[in-house]
Amino acid sequence: MDRSEIVARENPVITQRVTNLLRTNAPLLFMPIDIHEVRYGAYMLFMYGSLENGYKAEVRIENIPVFFDVQIESDNTNQLFLKSLLAAENITYERLETLTQRPVMGYREKEKEFAPYIRIFFKSLYERRKAITYLNNMGYNTAADDTTCYYRMVSRELKLPLTTWIQLQHYSYEPRGLVHRFSVTPEDLVSYQDDGPTDHSIVMAYDIETYSPVKGTVPDPNQANDVVFMICMRIFWIHSTEPLASTCITMAPCKKSPEWTTIVCSSEKNLLLSFAEQFSRWAPDICTGFNDSRYDWPFIVEKSMQHGILEEVFNKMSLFWPQKLDTILKCYYVKEKRVKISAEKSIISSFLHTPGCLPIDVRNMCMQLYPKAEKTSLKAFLENCGLDSKVDLPYHLMWKYYETRDSEKMADVAYYCIIDAQRCQDLLVRHNVIPDRREVGILSYTSLYDCIYYAGGHKVCNMLIAYAIHDEYGRIACSTIARGKREHGKYPGAFVIDPVKGLEQDKPTTGLDFASLYPSLIMAYNFSPEKFVASRDEANSLMAKGESLHYVSFHFNNRLVEGWFVRHNNVPDKMGLYPKVLIDLLNKRTALKQELKKLGEKKECIHESHPGFKELQFRHAMVDAKQKALKIFMNTFYGEAGNNLSPFFLLPLAGGVTSSGQYNLKLVYNFVINKGYGIKYGDTDSLYITCPDSLYTEVTDAYLNSQKTTKHYEQLCHEKVLLSMKAMSTLCAEVNEYLRQDNGTSYLRMAYEEVLFPVCFTGKKKYYGIAHVNTPNFNTKELFIRGIDIIKQGQTKLTKTIGTRIMEESMKLRRPEDHRPPLIEIVKTVLKDAVVNMKQWNFEDFIQTDAWRPDKDNKAVQIFMSRMHARREQLKKHGAAATSQFAEPEPGERFSYVIVEKQVQFDIQGHRTDTTRKGDKMEYVSEAKAKNLPIDILFYINNYVLGLCARFINENEEFQPPGNVSNKDEYAQRRAKSYLQKFVQSIHPKDKSVIKQGIVHRQCYKYVHQEIKKKIGIFADLYKEFFNNTTNPIESFIQSTQFMIHYFDEEQKVNHSMKKMVEQHAALAGNPAGNPAGNPAGNPAGNPAGNPAGNPAGNPAGNPAGNPAGNPAGNPAGNPASNALMRAIFTQLITEEKKIVQALYNKGDEIHDLLTYIINNINYKIATFQTKQMLTFELSSTHVELLLKLNKTWLILVGIRVAKKHLHALLGLHNNEPPSKTFIQQAIEEECGSIKPSCYDFIS
């Protein structure tokens, strides 16, 4: 079923009426959704949307004039001069027109108010842009000079909003397939002023399912074997969540369902073509998915490219004329569109923008609505809205069903996919996304695409120009090109009165706020660029003529900036552009809020089953969307005025607004103080005020004369709040009258919002209390909290719970006669309970969130992601089936984690070696839960809770800094946190055990080292040097001793080879008795026990060093053959040593297991405070055998190395007589003495 058939089925009556109107060429209503321009050749504008009944329509606007304006002052006002300028650059134009307009920058007196401009008309945008660039470079001021999107200028000039109903008149009509094509001129388009009928534009929500044969990975469109195997689509009316039709396109057999049409394709290529075909049949106005701009669209486009069908797919989906592949990729595939989520965050989107259909990513919309959301999944946003959740189907099961081609199970996959698409529309409707954006577009004369993909400042700028260029606002000529030097610096700061920190339990505090301070200042002081006077001489001249001026001055980048603005004195004709626009917006919003209130009251009186309820609900949503749009513009107005990239930017205006805010808050401050009121705190646009004590004298005396029960005290507090409310109402009226007298207008006003009692101020912009708005409300369930970190994004439930407990406990009403614990006592009590009673906390209390931003230097997150990458790679090496649990989130996406406890580790000398870095302790929530990893509660307390707790108590006298400290708050906060850290250390049992464990470790090390030194002499020093230079004993020990680990089977062969070489050497040297045959290495025959280990290598006992027995010192070698043999022996020793090293390396795993076993036992015995007993272990026979062989091999290697030294000495002395003992025996005896090291001694 195609779109026309669906429309006829759903709206038969309206369809018949629209058909009749088309036959008679009568005026029709058209709702634009998407805009496309033909920028080459003659300019044309195409608008795509729907007619009243839902028919798809294309409106082509022809004969649109292409022009811009240029201001030419002094004698060069004639057209001939401009013609000569254009001719010099070979710029072709159609005609010139002279007109007068008011320049937007700088005040002009009435007789000089208008300046001459020349409007230049062109045949194409190319020539227009060329002329704008040339004249700007020449220094001329231009206006109506949009260079990116000309349709915005068309909309402004014609006063024709692009997001609401338009009436088509005098059109030419041509039906072509599903699309009703109209051709009109600008004069044939009329803005429809009423709300219009129900919009029947069509939204297509879709979702894709992908597959990869590599389990545990996210399918990648660049991988040939990764495929999209299913696409599900569902269409709706734009305002409804009831589906009109549904389709499932799949590559696997799928059981049919009455809820959707199933299309089975034989290949991925056919699936993509079927998707394009179905898209063209429905011709949706809006296409939406969840995160589709970051996954679905890039996947579809990339796969279409691989199959060579992107051109065909695009042209099927597009309502425009066919395009070539290079044009599609250049103009219609938006690869990197930066979408602003909040002031600090943007996200990159990619999508295929086919003419006639506007793509909307629901995830982006929800992130803009919830910029501080910790989870940004579809499931999370559905939960936030109270909507039905998505279907739960794990990916590994989905892929299994696809692999098995089970049609029953594939129906489950299709249902999962269809429901995901359904939930996208549910979210769009619930949040009123399209109507809200449309209202913004109506005000700003921008398209729906602009309202979705561009930031607020862009729309405010366009709205200002739309107001400015029309007669009722003075025909102000505005440029869209920012000019002048762009300076970066800070405007005057706000006026701040430091808070009186601490808990206030005796007197109510009332907040007095300016209503919309910056817009109010703009309206009051006539801040507008065309009302600005730059020079003092001109200002004096104007004042001499009776004009009233507002002077502004402030310091910016080390210089004085000053200026004057001509005041309006409440005369409408004197009001500037900015105040006029703001007043108009304010009046509109006030009227809408009044209407909204009435509609809300009606909604409460009508049941949902009433026939008129839906219409009432729709009307309520529309009015609410309009007032929200007005609020957005008013709130972002100053932001654009202070944006130095804006064409409206004026430094004296931007700084003048903030300095005027500072002035007025000081004015109110002094007025209130002189009235006898106290100030608890003040900042930017608000003051927190306490009434004079005399106000409460009567009620206080009544309490003191009562029985002073709890009930009497509650009554006293109740009456104090009522008295404060009454006094503040009077004070507020007096303040507003005082402001009116000072600035001469009623635009700048203050209002009191709430009375806080009790209340606690902990720092600038940080306070909490019980709020009383209309009546006293001591039984409230929610505290009034501002700036306290428990509501900070990413914060754990642990921190929120502890912070809430402290605040709730401190807000309890306590009589002066009772014990009123100071805040520090409350904090310590709550903190002690949190630390000592650990069992009260659940796993969920420790879950945190953070954002993954690869370009930001968030060290903890960077370390964590590096660990996860290494873990994924390790799993892949071992052929693990899944690594998705360690997957890296998308840039900008938030992820959940916990801080887990790492085993306390010490080096062999008792120094802690376990990491304290946060990034090394972070684990994904799923991983920590699956492995039941212990939470590092102390880390949370020290790093997240204590800072919050310190904020409550840092006003205490003991934490205050000396007088020469500049940042007193920071100093006090640091001291308070240090105090609480010591408090936690005193009550946390684990900290004590860790300290004791380190002491025991150091004692054990000292004892072990002494024992080893007794037994192996020189080896103890080598052992000590090794462990002093390592932070990981097991791994480093293995690396340093890999040459000691195998070659046991070859031991006898090595000994035999060495003995044979020595015998040959002795025979040639004429000393056959030098090496008793059969003497095994490692057991020197005839060597008495206790032979000193200090005997120099190569010097037989009793022989002078360097002088072999029987050979005079320095006697040259008398036998060249013997000399050569010694070299051969030396070479053989090196060869044998290399063989041992290589062979022993292969036994690494066995020795690793052994060392791990021993080290773990050491740690266990240290943890249980066993000292000398730790030297005894119960080892298996395998371990014992390995230790014995390791011991022997060590000795062999030592022998070889010492033998090399002997040979080197012999060669150096040209001595051909060998020592009296074998080299190996001599080495062992000299290096180890008569006491051979035991197995455990050696390993330790």
Curated annotation (Swiss-Prot):
Annotated spans, 13 X 4 AA tandem repeats of A-G-N-P: 1069-1120
EC number(s) stated in the UniProt entry for this protein: 2.7.7.7
SUPFAM superfamilies given in the database record: DNA/RNA polymerases, Ribonuclease H-like
InterPro entries per UniProt: DNA-dir_DNA_pol_B, DNA-dir_DNA_pol_B_CS, DNA-dir_DNA_pol_B_exonuc, DNA-dir_DNA_pol_B_multi_dom, DNA/RNA_pol_sf, DNA_pol_B_thumb, DNA_pol_palm_dom_sf, DNA_pol_type-B
GO biological process entries: DNA-templated DNA replication; viral DNA genome replication
Top enzyme category: transferase
Catalysis performed (reactions): DNA(n) + a 2'-deoxyribonucleoside 5'-triphosphate = DNA(n+1) + diphosphate
Entry GO MF terms: DNA binding; DNA-directed DNA polymerase activity; nucleotide binding
Effect of residue 512 to F: In strain: Isolate PAAR-463; phosphonoacetate-resistant
Renumbered residue ranges of the record's region Disordered: 1069-1118
Family to which this protein belongs: Belongs to the DNA polymerase type-B family.
General function of this protein: DNA-directed DNA polymerase involved in viral DNA replication.
Additional notes on this entry: Consistent with its intracellular location, ASFV encodes its own replicative DNA polymerase and three base excision repair enzymes: a class II AP endonuclease, the repair polymerase Pol X, and an ATP-dependent DNA ligase.
Protein name as it appears in the record: DNA polymerase beta
